[in-house]
Amino acid sequence: MKLTCVVIVAVLLLTACQLLTADDSRGTQKHRALRSDTKLSMSTRCKGKGAPCRKTMYDCCSGSCGRRGKCG
């Protein structure tokens, strides 16, 4: 019984720590999943329309690199 209570308290403490850490780090990851162009442009420096780009770098503010290697 005592061991069960200790385990429950430990799980609750770890859960609380996870929730606090997740709340503090919200919006600070640079390339999490590239969910939106707005988040990408706010977290990194992006290139404007017509600037040279690479499709693998995701560095255009618009989020799209054209066929000719220029931001769209």
Swiss-Prot record:
InterPro entries, A to Z: Conotoxin (IPR004214), Conotoxin_omega-typ_CS (IPR012321)
Pfam family, one: Conotoxin
Main location: secreted
Family: Belongs to the conotoxin O1 superfamily.
Protein name, UniProt field: Omega-conotoxin-like S6.6
Presence of keyword Secreted: yes
A cellular-component GO term for this protein: host cell presynaptic membrane
Compartment list: Secreted
Pro-sequence residue ranges: 23-45
Entry remark concerning the domains of this protein: The presence of a 'disulfide through disulfide knot' structurally defines this protein as a knottin. The cysteine framework is VI/VII (C-C-CC-C-C).
Molecular function (Gene Ontology), one example: calcium channel regulator activity
In-chain residues carrying the UniProt-annotated modification Cysteine amide: 71
Keyword set, alphabetical order: Amidation, Calcium channel impairing toxin, Disulfide bond, Ion channel impairing toxin, Knottin, Neurotoxin, Presynaptic neurotoxin, Secreted, Signal, Toxin, Voltage-gated calcium channel impairing toxin
Chloroplast among keywords: no
Signal peptide range: 1-22
Annotated tissue distribution: Expressed by the venom duct.
Organism: Conus striatus (Striated cone)
Chain's role: Omega-conotoxins act at presynaptic membranes, they bind and block voltage-gated calcium channels (Cav). This toxin blocks N-, P- and Q-type calcium channels.
Organism lineage string: Eukaryota, Metazoa, Spiralia, Lophotrochozoa, Mollusca
Disulfide feature: 46-61, 53-65, 60-71
